[in-house]
Amino acid sequence: MIEYIRGIIEDIGPDHVIIDLMGIGIKIFVPFSTMKELPPKGNITKLYTYLYVREDGFQIFGFKRKEELELFEKLLSVSGVGPKGALSILSVVPIESFIKAVNSGDYKILTAAPGIGKKTAERIILELKDKVPKEVVVPKEDSLLNEALEALLALGYTKSEAIYALSDVNCESVEQAVKEALKKLAK
């Protein structure tokens, strides 16, 4: 329903972030993996979102990478796994480790997440074995952006400045990403 939200970070809580979107503060629950990639308060960020509707209200869950959102949605398809359980897994288990665990049947990795016991972990593996890729592929865009981030850091920009400058860059090459980011930083 809502593909993504781009706005200014107003506040960061232990499991959520408040994004100011044209004067409206939106509370978005995020996994730890997304939390550690967020720029500081006052900077712009973009999160891919999932709107969860319950009888007593709405909750929005956000992810820095689209692959995390897709995995979150797959976890919700498993009986007995709700949004908080799926978020717990994504907070503790990196995507690459999750995919390896599902493909190898290693439920112990999944039980590291709070609220996920042996039976739930085994059910996740059983139900998602045919739904996750056989091997982990780092998205090209992420690796390009990481290289561009390193280049901006080498040029003397702070990590928060570099992340902000690269937040909405669509790139085909590292050079192109750095050029677009430098233009944004020059404004």
Swiss-Prot record:
* Keyword DNA-binding attributed: yes
* SMART domains associated with the record: HhH1 (SM00278)
Region (Flexible linker), start-end ranges: 136-139
Give UniProt keywords alphabetically: Cytoplasm, DNA damage, DNA recombination, DNA repair, DNA-binding
Which region ranges are annotated with the description Domain III?
140-187
GO MF term set? ATP binding; four-way junction DNA binding; four-way junction helicase activity
Q: Where is this region: Domain II?
A: 65-136
Q: Where in the cell is it found?
A: Cytoplasm
User: Could you give the domain comment from the record?
Assistant: Has three domains with a flexible linker between the domains II and III and assumes an 'L' shape. Domain III is highly mobile and contacts RuvB.
Q: Which protein family is named in the record? A: Belongs to the RuvA family.
Protein name according to UniProt: Holliday junction branch migration complex subunit RuvA
Task: Name the gene for this chain.
Answer: ruvA
